[in-house]
């Protein structure tokens, strides 16, 4: 039996209850084409195939690829040996994603799967069921004013809705990780919020949350005059001394547009 390799961030999910909740959350039907990232030893692959869906599995570990090819002999199963971050996803034709994500690539992988505010992925996946570190899950679902709320929260919520499916304790894995995990369901928006300049919004978010304890007027001073930021916040009905973490997605969209227009005048 192949052992989990630390350099690949491998932890085998072995809880049948958690596996069942992941499959249920994916709402699979015959005709679905599922991108499975990091199939490992096939614990999720088998129920995915049982559902009647087609499965495109991407695995970096060569030894595991050999085992998976022997294990799954189905016309509905395609295995790609390689790095998911280097793979062009569009030609695969998948409409859903199911993944037990290696925690060391979570950030880049989210960008690869969802795109960005400036360059959203199109066509978008219908839904993504992702097993992630609890800290990341908290950030994806965070509300304004909370400790977990940050630029990642705003970016992801611009692109998709995010809901918790279930908590996953360390004992659900072999070997158990040192952190708690969570399964989340991401459903990309069919219609994205309107924004005058997506790149400008990205720039504001990066700068605003880089020094999150500073008032926005000071955090953004390399981009906009502090007094203009204060006036813009007041115009939007917000406190002139607001910090980045106090603003909702809607606030950021409105602030971005007001400041963009000020910059043009």
Curated annotation (Swiss-Prot):
It catalyses: adenosine(1518)/adenosine(1519) in 16S rRNA + 4 S-adenosyl-L-methionine = N(6)-dimethyladenosine(1518)/N(6)-dimethyladenosine(1519) in 16S rRNA + 4 S-adenosyl-L-homocysteine + 4 H(+). One of its GO terms (cellular component) is cytosol. Keywords: Cytoplasm, Methyltransferase, RNA-binding, rRNA processing, S-adenosyl-L-methionine, Transferase. Its EC number is 2.1.1.182. CDD domains: AdoMet_MTases. Pfam families: RrnaAD. Its main location: cytoplasm. The keyword Methyltransferase applies. SUPFAM superfamilies: S-adenosyl-L-methionine-dependent methyltransferases (SSF53335). S-adenosyl-L-methionine binds at residues 11, 13, 38, 59, 83, 100. InterPro entries: KsgA/Erm (IPR001737), rRNA_Ade_diMease-like_C (IPR023165), rRNA_Ade_Mease_Trfase_CS (IPR020596), rRNA_Ade_methylase_Trfase_N (IPR020598), rRNA_adenine_dimethylase (IPR011530), SAM-dependent_MTases_sf (IPR029063). It is found in: Cytoplasm. GO terms for molecular function: 16S rRNA (adenine(1518)-N(6)/adenine(1519)-N(6))-dimethyltransferase activity; RNA binding. Belongs to the class I-like SAM-binding methyltransferase superfamily. rRNA adenine N(6)-methyltransferase family. RsmA subfamily. Specifically dimethylates two adjacent adenosines (A1518 and A1519) in the loop of a conserved hairpin near the 3'-end of 16S rRNA in the 30S particle. May play a critical role in biogenesis of 30S subunits. This is Ribosomal RNA small subunit methyltransferase A. The gene is rsmA.
């Amino acid at each position: 039996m192949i052992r989990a390799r630390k350099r690949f961030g491998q932890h085998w999910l072995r809880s049948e209850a958690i596996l069942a909740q992941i499959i249920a959350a994916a709402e699979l039907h015959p005709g679905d084409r599922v991108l499975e990232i990091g199939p490992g030893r096939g614990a999720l692959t088998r129920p995915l195939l049982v559902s009647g869906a087609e499965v495109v599995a991407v695995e970096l570990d060569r030894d595991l690829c050999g085992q998976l090819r022997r294990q799954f002999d189905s016309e509905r199963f395609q295995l790609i040996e390689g790095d998911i971050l280097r793979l062009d996803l569009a030609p695969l034709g998948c409409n859903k994603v199911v993944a037990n994500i290696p925690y060391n690539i979570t950030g880049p992988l989210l960008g690869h799967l969802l795109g960005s505010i400036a360059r959203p992925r199109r066509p978008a996946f219908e839904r993504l069921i992702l097993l992630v570190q609890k800290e990341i899950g908290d950030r994806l679902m965070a509300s304004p004013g909370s400790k977990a709320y940050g630029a990642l929260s705003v970016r992801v919520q611009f692109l998709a809705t995010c809901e918790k499916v279930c908590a996953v304790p360390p004992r659900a894995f072999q070997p158990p990780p040192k952190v708690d995990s969570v399964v989340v369901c991401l459903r990309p928006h069919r219609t994205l919020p309107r924004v005058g300049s997506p790149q400008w919004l990205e720039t504001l978010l990066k700068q605003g949350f880089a020094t999150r304890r500073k008032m926005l007027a000071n955090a953004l001073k390399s981009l906009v005059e502090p007094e203009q930021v204060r006036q813009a916040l007041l115009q939007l009905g917000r406190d002139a001394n607001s910090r980045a973490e106090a603003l909702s997605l809607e606030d950021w969209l409105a602030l971005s547009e007001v400041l963009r227009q000020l910059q043009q005048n």
